Amino acid sequence: MSGMSGSHAVSQESEHVLFAVRGSCDMCKERIEKAAKGVNGVLSAHWDKDTQMIHLQYDPQKTSPKAISKAIAKVGHDTDMDKADKAVYDKLPACCHYR
């Protein structure tokens, strides 16, 4: 008997999505993935610097790609759906500037 008390069959209810996220370095990768994983319902987030794409696994009952995109934009990275505020973007380290 495994401790199933707080867990659900989330993997069966989860969905995958890919969308573009602009960034330029490993610091960007860390920031982008941290922002995505900070959204309740995100199970995994992997951003690829070369393709500029993020692969997400999430629980659609708890969040949506749009909500995750907004969280990423709030930390300074443009996505297919949302543009980061210029003031936030300007505060990124120089190596993270992609515009």
Where are these regions (language model features)?
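Short, surface-exposed ligand-recognition loops at beta-strand->loop->(often short) alpha-helix junctions
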Residues: 19-28
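Short acidic amphipathic segments
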Residues: 36-48
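Helix N-cap motif at beta-to-alpha junctions
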Residues: 59-65
